[in-house]
From Swiss-Prot:
It catalyses: (2R)-2-phosphoglycerate = phosphoenolpyruvate + H2O. The active site is at E204, K334. Pfam families: Enolase_C (PF00113), Enolase_N (PF03952). SUPFAM superfamilies: Enolase C-terminal domain-like (SSF51604), Enolase N-terminal domain-like (SSF54826). SMART domains: Enolase_C, Enolase_N. GO terms for biological process: glycolytic process. One of its GO terms (cellular component) is extracellular region. This is Enolase. It comes from Pelagibacter ubique (strain HTCC1062). PANTHER family: ENOLASE. Its EC number is 4.2.1.11. (2R)-2-phosphoglycerate binds at Q162, K334, R363, S364, K385.
Length: 418
């Protein structure tokens, strides 16, 4: 039996230049490390991200206190534990914290250790990480939901909707999916330049031109798809992350303009852009507690992927409530929303049993860590959301998926999205 002999944490930086935590777990001869990501638009019910809140240290954003918790409290509790018993490791971490949202130790401390332990277990077994999750054979590659225009909390350009994405629906393999996205992105860049707009990028690598109107952004995306020789809604589909929590006041929303309107009016406007632009996926169309609005949208849309992110926060209890209310048909999976690998796998497993599509996701403050690429393949998740073909912390995940596809060889195939 391989046991945990040592755990060491350190403060490093995420892709937004903010401090985050890296944990390294050691066995007798090997070690593995993992870096915890961080979100910008976060749900109220997410597991707690613990920071020092000392303005003299990184303007209150340092995690040195959290690092110390790993190096003392967590390390002491886990030393001697079987590295291959992920459930036990995570249960010890959960019980040691003792709170619903992991406020004592911080989900960032817990997750970094949980991920590092999972990596080390695979390393000791000398198997690829993706082979250590839920699937034991017949691995599927996810379709990329590639962010090509950033708005909302991810860019300072006035766009209401946070993410405009493309999905290469007709790609026969992951390599082809990447090629299709590459072509559309490069044609989009040319169109943006032609309009005299900036091609600077947002937090997740998508372009962030100064466009204040959602439909103008959508027109640009459609033009880029057409210019690339593809059919919108058939070869390539447009997908949105609205992040409606950021656009809500009481029971009204300002999604499509600065004017706040009712849920019913918002649904009418959604239906309009769905039909006009052949939108195939909408994430967080309404607020995290507006269950009725979500259910109404589900009743008023057909063949559209309605994705719960802030609604579910990778939490099994909230997912079960959403299922009973018919609130969505898909769930976004973010490891740091719940805080351990085991709990994340539990949510994915349940979501797939009830017929939901599972979409593995990065965070806007991410790193070179590629754990989620392996997680997507190892759970046969339908899609992965990990930014654009810009910024190395985003591209790192795509490169890992290409490596996995190459390793699988003729056994590699794409997941189902319809």
């Amino acid at each position: 039996m391989s046991k945990i002999l040592k755990i060491k944490a350190r403060q490093v930086f995420d892709s937004r230049g903010n401090p985050t935590i890296e944990a390294e777990v050691y066995s007798k001869k090997l070690s593995a490390s993992a870096i915890c990501p961080s979100g910008a638009s976060t749900g109220t019910y997410e597991a707690f991200e613990k920071r020092d809140d000392n303005n003299k240290k990184y303007l209150g954003k340092s995690v040195l206190g959290t690092v110390n918790l790993v190096n003392t409290k967590i390390s002491k509790k886990l030393i001697g534990t079987n590295i291959h018993d992920q459930t036990r490791i995570d249960t010890i971490l959960i019980n040691l914290d003792g709170t619903r949202q992991k406020t004592n130790l911080g989900a960032n401390a817990i997750l970094a250790v949980s991920m590092a332990a999972k990596k080390l277990s695979a390393k000791i077994k000398n198997v690829p990480l993706y082979k250590t999750f839920l699937v034991k054979n017949n691995y599927k590659l996810p379709y990329p939901l590639m962010n090509i225009i950033n708005g909302g909390a991810h860019a300072n350009n006035g766009l209401r909707i946070q993410e405009f994405m493309i999905r290469p629906d007709k790609a026969k393999n992951f390599s082809e999916a990447m090629r299709i996205c590459f072509v559309v992105i490069n044609n989009l860049k040319k169109l943006i330049i032609k309009k005299g707009l900036s091609t600077s990028v947002g937090d997740e690598g998508g372009f962030a031109p100064m466009i204040s109107n959602n439909e103008k952004a959508l027109d640009l995306v459609v033009a880029a798809i057409n210019k690339s020789g593809f059919k919108n809604g058939k070869d390539v589909s447009i997908c949105l992350d609205v992040a409606a929590n950021e656009l809500m006041k009481k029971d009204k929303y300002s999604i499509h303009s600065k004017k706040f309107v009712s849920v019913d009016q918002s649904i009418k406007e959604y239906k309009k852009i769905i039909n006009k632009y052949k939108i195939k996926s909408i994430e967080d169309p309404f607020g995290e507690n507006d269950w009725m609005a979500w259910s109404k949208l589900m009743k008023n849309t057909n063949n559209v992927q309605i994705v719960g992110d802030d609604l579910y926060v990778t939490n099994l209890e909230r997912l079960k409530k959403g299922f009973l209310n018919n609130s969505s048909n898909s769930i976004l999976i973010k490891l740091n929303q719940i805080g351990t690998v085991s709990e994340t796998l539990e949510v994915i497993k349940f979501a797939q049993i009830i017929g939901y599509k599972t979409i593995i996701s990065h965070r806007s403050g991410d790193s070179e860590d590629t754990f989620i690429a392996d997680l997507a393949v190892g759970t046969n998740s339908n899609q992965i959301k990990t930014g654009s073909l810009a910024r190395s912390e985003r591209v790192a995940k795509y490169n890992q998926l290409l490596r996995i596809e190459e390793e699988l060889g003729k056994k590699a195939s794409m997941s189902k999205i319809h």
